Amino acid sequence: MKKTTLLHEGKAKKVFLTDEADLVIQEFKDDATAFNNKKKGTIAEKGVVNNAISCKLFTMLEGEGVRTHLVEKLSDRDMLCKKLDIIKVEVVVRNIAAGSLVKRYGFTEGSVLREPIVEFYLKNDDLDDPLMNESHAVALGVASLDELAVLGTRALRVNEVLKPFFAGVKLKLVDFKLEFGRHHGEILLGDEISPDTCRFWDLETNEKLDKDRFRLDLGGIEDAYSEVQKRVLGSGALS
């Protein structure tokens, strides 16, 4: 499978058309951004790490009944995917209070939430991806109530699968962002699952092992991403 036309370039990935109309190639970049592109940099080999982790986790989720856009891993940086009509909703699941949740509601950082919190954000960089509810999403025409119900249920199912998996490799799944898309009438999980889109803390020390190291200028970014990759892939499947 070969890349043809560049369909879209985002902050962390490029998406290329292929010679099959229903398939695209997602190429992972080393570019790093934070605060909706206000902070920019590069993390060496980030694309390789995130592709490897995402392929492993998507494969695991498929085995647990969560349909994803993954077809196969093509190379270190390239993932062959089903072409999706992306739903302009970012779904965030939170297990532990961190980041904007602490700022908005006064939670103590690190406090375990009684139940996972599911949040919807409008996928719009120009508006800084604002938090929204179901009524906003329907009014904006980005998703129907039925679709939003699927997104919420599917996101919680992903959490049910991934949270114990990460605990098994000594990582706390603090929170994570998911994106979904429509494919021939079906809603599939898309994008990626990686230290770019998740907060991971070491189970014993609470050391941050994700993009917060870039956001907060903590240093050791490459080592943190590599450590997550080692733990995830060392658990037994794809390399």
From Swiss-Prot:
Q: Which family does it belong to?
A: Belongs to the SAICAR synthetase family.
**What chemistry does it catalyse, as a reaction equation?**
5-amino-1-(5-phospho-D-ribosyl)imidazole-4-carboxylate + L-aspartate + ATP = (2S)-2-[5-amino-1-(5-phospho-beta-D-ribosyl)imidazole-4-carboxamido]succinate + ADP + phosphate + 2 H(+)
> One Pfam family this chain carries?
SAICAR_synt
What organism does the record attribute this protein to?
A: Chlorobium luteolum (strain DSM 273 / BCRC 81028 / 2530)
Entries under CDD domains matching the protein: SAICAR_synt_PurC
Question: Pathway listed for it?
Answer: Purine metabolism; IMP biosynthesis via de novo pathway; 5-amino-1-(5-phospho-D-ribosyl)imidazole-4-carboxamide from 5-amino-1-(5-phospho-D-ribosyl)imidazole-4-carboxylate: step 1/2
Cite the GO molecular-function annotations of the record.
ATP binding; phosphoribosylaminoimidazolesuccinocarboxamide synthase activity
Q: Which GO terms describe its biological process?
A: 'de novo' IMP biosynthetic process; cobalamin biosynthetic process
Question: Which SUPFAM superfamilies does the record cross-reference, listed alphabetically?
Answer: SAICAR synthase-like
Provide the E.C. number(s) assigned to this enzyme: 6.3.2.6
- Spell out the coiled coil positions from the record: none
| Full protein name | Phosphoribosylaminoimidazole-succinocarboxamide synthase
Keyword terms of this UniProt record: ATP-binding, Ligase, Nucleotide-binding, Purine biosynthesis
Look up the signal peptide feature and give its range: none
